[in-house]
């Protein structure tokens, strides 16, 4: 628990102190955000706001994670695990793709960065490497960071994927979550606040897995998860980094996370869901992200098949703006919905454990 608190504290500190430095630097360099011409009129005043704030988020996550492990050396904490490094590696790789995308947008002074093909190739490459590596690094108990079994709150032994299918499954998960968070990042503080709650829920889940790991506490309801405490530190550091960034990103935002941050954060969810064996449960925890990307898919499908749009604008947070909701109203209500779905997700997780132990 001490390591988790340290991870949060370090991540918040680094993120909240580094972000204003980036604001001044990016403002001086003219690294301003470009606004969609077809977006809500109220957003045009945001043109020129510094972007690429995801750099501070990634720095906070890395600092929180490494700081917690360094502190752990003083009180016999667990060392760095393969699971945590793989999740961080995935997030950093996707953040790199987003950074290039943001840089192109800034250099060309338009809201279009990497073309779809290049961006997709970057996401797929990151996902394939993750999918291959996550089935390696078997520990003394025979556990790998990931499992080829589909999982809800633990592995579903009756649904096992062949290695190639598992890698393809990882491509779908990584692409879906990174794009989902990217679509959600359209209002001041929406993605950062939502992500803080989702990863806070993951802190509870992975810490519970750590306390009830089959390796150290065998028995009914135990979890076969490699490095659960390591995953809790990743989740805690991510929550802390998002909170620190939110201090500057809350409406009216002084800086945006850009694709650097949104793609990286999507990678964190994807990585945590695979390594903690909660791929299906993650859909409940991150229901808002799922709803946002679903609204985009439905908008495209309905327009191509009927010539009409289901929403006034997608992602659907813009739809609510265009029907008269204030931006802050949309943000707060979406945060409330996320708090509910995260609470539901944790309740489902705990309920499954109670059922497993026969309580």
Curated annotation (Swiss-Prot):
Segments passing through the bilayer: 3-23, 55-75, 80-100, 117-137, 156-176, 187-207, 231-251, 255-275, 280-300, 334-354
Family, as annotated: Belongs to the glycosyltransferase 4 family. MraY subfamily.
Keyword Cell wall biogenesis/degradation among UniProt keywords: yes
Pathway(s) annotated for this protein in UniProt: Cell wall biogenesis; peptidoglycan biosynthesis
Gene: mraY
Protein known as: Phospho-N-acetylmuramoyl-pentapeptide-transferase
Source organism, top-level taxon: Bacteria
Purpose: Catalyzes the initial step of the lipid cycle reactions in the biosynthesis of the cell wall peptidoglycan: transfers peptidoglycan precursor phospho-MurNAc-pentapeptide from UDP-MurNAc-pentapeptide onto the lipid carrier undecaprenyl phosphate, yielding undecaprenyl-pyrophosphoryl-MurNAc-pentapeptide, known as lipid I.
Entry EC no(s): 2.7.8.13
Membrane-protein topology: Multi-pass membrane protein
PROSITE patterns listed in its UniProt record: MRAY_1, MRAY_2
Gene Ontology biological process: cell division; cell wall macromolecule biosynthetic process; cell wall organization; peptidoglycan biosynthetic process; regulation of cell shape
Compartment(s) of residence: Cell membrane
Signal peptide (UniProt feature, chain positions): none
């Amino acid at each position: 628990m001490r390591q988790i608190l340290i991870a949060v504290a370090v991540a918040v500190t680094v993120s909240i102190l580094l972000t204003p430095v980036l604001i001044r630097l990016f403002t001086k360099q003219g690294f301003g955000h470009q606004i969609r011409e077809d977006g809500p009129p109220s957003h045009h005043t945001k043109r020129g706001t510094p972007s690429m704030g995801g750099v501070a988020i990634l720095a906070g996550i890395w600092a929180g994670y490494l700081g917690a492990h360094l502190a752990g050396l003083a009180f016999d904490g667990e060392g760095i695990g393969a699971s945590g490094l793989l999740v961080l590696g995935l997030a950093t790789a996707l953040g790199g793709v987003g950074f290039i995308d943001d840089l192109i947008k800034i250099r060309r002074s338009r809201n279009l960065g990497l073309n779809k093909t290049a961006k997709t190739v970057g996401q797929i490459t990151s996902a394939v490497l993750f999918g291959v590596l996550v089935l390696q690094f078997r520990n003394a108990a025979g556990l790998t960071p990931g499992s080829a079994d589909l999982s809800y709150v633990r592995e579903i032994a009756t649904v096992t994927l062949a290695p190639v299918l598992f890698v393809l499954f990882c491509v779908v998960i990584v692409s879906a979550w990174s794009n989902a968070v990217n679509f959600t990042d359209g209002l001041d503080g929406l993605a950062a606040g939502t992500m803080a709650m989702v990863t806070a829920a993951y802190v509870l889940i992975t810490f519970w897995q750590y306390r009830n790991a089959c390796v150290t506490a065998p028995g009914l309801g135990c979890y076969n998860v490699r490095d659960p405490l390591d995953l809790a530190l990743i989740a805690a550091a991510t929550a802390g980094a998002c909170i620190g960034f939110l201090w500057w990103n809350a409406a009216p935002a002084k800086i945006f996370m850009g694709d650097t941050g949104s793609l990286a954060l999507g990678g964190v969810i994807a990585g945590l869901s695979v390594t903690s064996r909660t791929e299906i449960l993650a859909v409940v925890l991150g229901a808002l992200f799922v709803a946002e990307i679903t609204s985009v898919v439905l908008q495209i499908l309905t327009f191509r098949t009927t010539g009409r749009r289901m929403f006034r604008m997608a992602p659907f947070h813009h739809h609510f703006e265009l029907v008269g909701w204030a931006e802050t109203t949309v943000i707060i209500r979406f945060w409330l919905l996320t708090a509910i779905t995260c609470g539901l997700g944790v309740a489902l997780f705990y309920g499954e454990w109670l059922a497993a132990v026969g309580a």
